[in-house]
C-alpha cells in the first residue's frame, strides 16, 4: 500500500500512520501537482476559497470582509471554475478561478496562504514550502483533525471559520516553523 506521506514525522498523524501492522505500507512522500521555483513576492496574503456550499460562500464572505481592510496586496481566489469574475477593491484582487499553473505561481508569489486543510492542499503547501493559516471546513472531521495536528506540530496556524481573525493569525504564524 503506497501512502503519500513521510515515513517518519508524517503530515497526517494517525490518518497515514495507523497503529496496526504496517509491513505492507510504503511511504512515498508528499505528492503535488505543483513545482517549487524562484518567485518574487507579489501578495502579502493569498486566500483560496473552497469547500461545499454553503460553507464555501460563508468562508468567502468572512475573508473578503477582512482582506478588504488589509493594508498590503492580497489575492482572493473564489474557487468558482465556472465563472470568469475579476474585481479589484482597495488592495484586494478577487478572481473567480485560477488554472493550476496560475495557482502554483500565486502561491509562490505570496507571503502567507489562507486555505482549507484538505490533505492535497497540505501536500501542495509542503512541496512549495509555504506558510499557511489552515481553516477547516466546518463538519469535515478529516480537515479538522489535520489542521489541529499540524498546528500542534508548529507547521501551520489553525483557526476555525467562525472566529477567523487574519490579523491575529498573521501574528501567531510568525512563531511557527518557517517552511521556506
Protein language model features and the residues they cover:
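Active-site-proximal region of nucleotide-activated glycan assembly enzymes
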Residues: 1-27
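Short glycine-/small-residue-rich Rossmann-like dinucleotide-binding loops
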Residues: 5, 50, 118
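Residues in the short beta-alpha loop(s) of Rossmann-like NAD(P)-binding domains
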Residues: 6, 80-82, 138
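Donor-nucleotide binding loops and adjacent catalytic segments primarily
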Residues: 16-17, 29-112, 122
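A short helix->loop->beta-strand "cap" motif at the edges of active sites that frequently abuts
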Residues: 22-23, 71-72, 130
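Short acidic-hydrophobic, aromatic-tinged amphipathic segments that line or gate anion-handling sites
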Residues: 26-29, 94-97, 155-164
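A donor-sugar binding/catalytic signature common to diverse glycosyltransferases
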Residues: 103-145
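Nucleotide-sugar donor-binding patch of glycosyltransferase catalytic domains
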Residues: 127-175
